[in-house]
C-alpha cells in the first residue's frame, strides 16, 4: 500500500490537483531508488498534479537511472508538473542538478 499525502484536494471542473507528496520509503520499502523501473513505479499516478514532492527521508542512495527518469525524462514529458525533492542529501541534490534536474 502506497502512502500518499495530498496537500490540497481536487478542485472542481477537472483541474489539476495542487500537490502530491510521495514518500519513497513507503513506495520502495526494501530498496533504494536506483532503476528507471523504480522511477516509473513512483510516478505512476503523478499526472493530474501541479507539483510532485518526493520525500527522500531514510534514503541513502539514488541511482542515475532513477534520477534521470524522474528529473529529466518525466519533466520533459510533463513540463506542467514540478518535481521537488524533499529531505534529499547534499550528494543527491548535486546529482539531480548535474544530471539534468531542472526543477528543484
Which stretches of residues belong to each language-model region?
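Flexible, glycine-/charge-rich segments associated with ATP-binding catalytic modules
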Residues: 1-37
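Amphipathic alpha-helical interaction surfaces in cytosolic regulatory modules
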Residues: 26-103
Amino acid at each position: 500500500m502506497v502512502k500518499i499525502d495530498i496537500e490540497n484536494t481536487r478542485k472542481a471542473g477537472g483541474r489539476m490537483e495542487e500537490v502530491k507528496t510521495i514518500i519513497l520509503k513507503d513506495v520502495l520499502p526494501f530498496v533504494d531508488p536506483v532503476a528507471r523501473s523504480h522511477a516509473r513505479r513512483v510516478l505512476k499516478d503523478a499526472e493530474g498534479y501541479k507539483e510532485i514532492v518526493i520525500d527522500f527521508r531514510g534514503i541513502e542512495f539514488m541511482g542515475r537511472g532513477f534520477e534521470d527518469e524522474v528529473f529529466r525524462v518525466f519533466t520533459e514529458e510533463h513540463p506542467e508538473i514540478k518535481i521537488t525533492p524533499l529531505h534529499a542529501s547534499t550528494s543527491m541534490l548535486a546529482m539531480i542538478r548535474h544530471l539534468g534536474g531542472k526543477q528543484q
